[in-house]
Amino acid sequence: LAVRKYLVIEEIPKTWMLGKADWNLRQLPEPADDKLLLYEKRLLNGLFESGDQVELSALRKTFAERLQAVKDALYDDMVSRKWFLRRPDRVRQTWVVIGSLALSAGIALTIVLAIFTKLGLLGIPFALGGLLLLIGAKWMPARTAKGTAMTRRVNGFRIVIEKAEEHMSKWAEQENVFTRFLPYAVVFGVTDKWAKAFESLGQLPSDTTWYVSSRPFVYAQFADSIDSFSVTTSGTIASTPAGSASSGFGGFGGGGAGGGGGGGGGGSW
């Protein structure tokens, strides 16, 4: 969203050396040449529910309750694109329930048979079967042929991003490639490689105005800052008050095409 000019990320200088990093998020007018998907709209509205500026730390333990609406829209989008026949999260939940019931029944059967008969071992297969279902629940959502094709495309693009240095001659002639594909590098966990590849060109990226820092632009430091922001954001918006169930932001993109929610010109990041 920042790369696409929906918001600006501003580093907040630390007041002391061991202080925690924080960022100010500032909403911008919606670009005329870009459209948001429903889950992106919900994410943006959730971030700026209280105004057009918010500090990232202020979202801790408050955003998680809004996150479920974002995830619902994301999973619905996956189904509407025909990547899955059913929402992956609901398929997983179904198998977790079945596995839990089988495990509980197996344990209960083992105890009852052990007390009243000599056939206590007969309940163990049910318990083991339930345990296996619980472990395998996250792999149960099956992609459609279209979803599998998208996964292959994403995995292929991941290889391209990971080996960015091999494509520098082509990308050097294109405008704003570093910034445009940076969100993918973050998702794929290769921000440092992406930055080093473009640093070798010996020129600064054309547009990083969406990220404001008091330090001059250096590729390595910029990659570091972006990774730090990404990790902090993931933890912050999924953080719940003590005693509440976690929303589990780690599952936000799970079950999709190679882990990505898909669509929206570069993801919601």
Predicted segments with their positions:
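Hydrophobic alpha-helical transmembrane segments
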Residues: 111-130
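Short hydrophobic helical membrane-anchoring segments positioned at the boundary
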Residues: 61-69, 73-88, 92-93, 128-131, ...
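Donor-sugar nucleotide-binding helix/loop cap in glycosyltransferases
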Residues: 2-106, 116-117, 143
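Hydrophobic alpha-helical transmembrane segments and adjacent interfacial helices
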Residues: 104-113, 132-135
